[in-house]
C-alpha cells in the first residue's frame, strides 16, 4: 500500500474505492501520508518497528490556486442581486468582514453588539454525514471579535426583524431554519451568474475583503 502511494500517489489497485481517472487528489495523498507518518513514528517510539518507512517519501506538490476576487465594479451589482433575493445582510457582512462561510452562517443574534458595533465569532457550521453540525472554529485564533460598519449593524437589525424568534442571524428563506452552507454557496454562484460576473469561489470573497481592505488602508485584523 505505502509503496504504491510513495511511487505515484495513487491507489488504483483498490478497485472497491471509487476514484476519478486521475486517482486521489494531491491534498488527499498528503493527508494520507501525514496520518501514516504519525502512526509509524509512534510505532518506532514503541519499538514495534526499527525505522519509519514514511521518512523521505516524495510527496506530490500542492498546486497553487490562482487567487481571484470579486472586481470592484461588480460589488454593487452583486449586493443588489443579493438584496433582490432577500439576502443583502448576509452578503454585505461577508464582504465587510471576510468571514468563513461556516462562521457567517453560525452567527447568533447574541453575537452582535449593536452599541459597540462588533460581532463575536466563536463557532462554525458544517454539513457532516448529512447533518448540520455547529462546532468551534479551526483554530483558537479563529475565535475573535470584529468591528463592523454602521450599515452592517442596521442591516443585521432589519434581518433579525424578519425572524425575531430565531436565534440565528441568517436563516434559509425556504426552511426558516439555519442556512445550509451548500445552499448558501449555490446562492452565491447564482448571484454571480445573474450579474454576468466571472465565477469565483465563495471563499474568494474573503480574498476580496482582504484585498480591498489593504487597498484602502483598513486593518483586516
Residue spans of the language-model regions?
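Alpha-helical scaffold segments in carbohydrate-active enzymes
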Residues: 4, 28-31, 35-45, 216
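Short, basic (Lys/Arg/His-rich) helix/loop patches that form interaction surfaces
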Residues: 13-14, 22, 77-87, 97, ...
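Basic/aromatic-enriched alpha-helical hairpins
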Residues: 1-22, 39-42, 196
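Short, flexible, glycine-rich and Lys/Arg-enriched loop motifs at helix boundaries
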Residues: 123-141
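Hydrophobic residues embedded in beta-strands of well-ordered beta-sheets
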Residues: 117-119
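Basic, Lys/Arg- and aromatic-enriched nucleic-acid-binding interface segment
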Residues: 12-14, 21-26, 30-32, 45, ...
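Generic beta-structure capping elements
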Residues: 3, 59-62, 122-124, 151, ...
Amino acid at each position: 500500500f505505502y509503496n504504491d502511494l510513495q511511487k505515484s500517489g495513487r491507489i488504483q489497485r483498490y478497485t472497491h474505492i471509487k476514484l476519478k481517472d486521475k486517482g486521489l487528489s494531491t491534498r488527499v495523498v498528503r493527508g494520507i501520508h501525514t496520518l501514516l507518518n504519525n502512526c509509524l513514528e509512534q510505532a518506532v517510539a514503541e519499538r514495534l518497528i526499527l525505522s519509519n518507512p514514511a521518512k523521505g517519501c516524495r510527496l506530490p506538490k500542492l498546486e497553487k490556486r490562482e487567487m481571484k476576487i470579486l472586481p470592484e465594479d461588480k460589488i454593487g451589482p452583486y449586493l443588489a442581486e443579493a438584496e433582490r433575493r432577500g439576502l443583502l445582510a448576509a452578503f454585505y457582512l461577508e464582504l465587510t468582514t471576510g468571514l468563513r462561510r461556516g462562521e457567517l452562517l453560525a452567527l447568533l443574534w447574541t453575537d452582535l453588539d449593536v452599541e459597540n458595533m462588533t460581532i463575536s465569532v466563536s463557532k462554525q457550521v458544517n454539513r457532516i454525514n448529512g447533518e448540520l453540525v455547529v462546532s468551534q472554529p479551526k483554530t483558537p485564533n479563529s475565535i475573535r471579535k470584529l468591528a463592523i460598519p454602521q450599515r452592517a449593524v442596521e442591516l443585521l437589525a432589519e434581518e433579525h426583524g424578519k425572524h425575531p424568534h430565531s436565534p440565528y442571524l441568517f436563516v434559509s428563506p425556504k426552511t426558516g431554519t439555519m442556512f445550509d452552507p451548500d445552499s448558501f454557496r449555490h446562492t452565491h454562484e447564482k448571484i454571480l451568474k445573474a450579474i454576468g460576473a466571472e465565477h469565483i469561489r465563495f471563499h474568494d470573497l474573503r480574498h476580496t475583503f482582504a484585498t480591498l481592505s489593504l487597498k484602502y488602508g483598513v486593518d483586516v485584523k
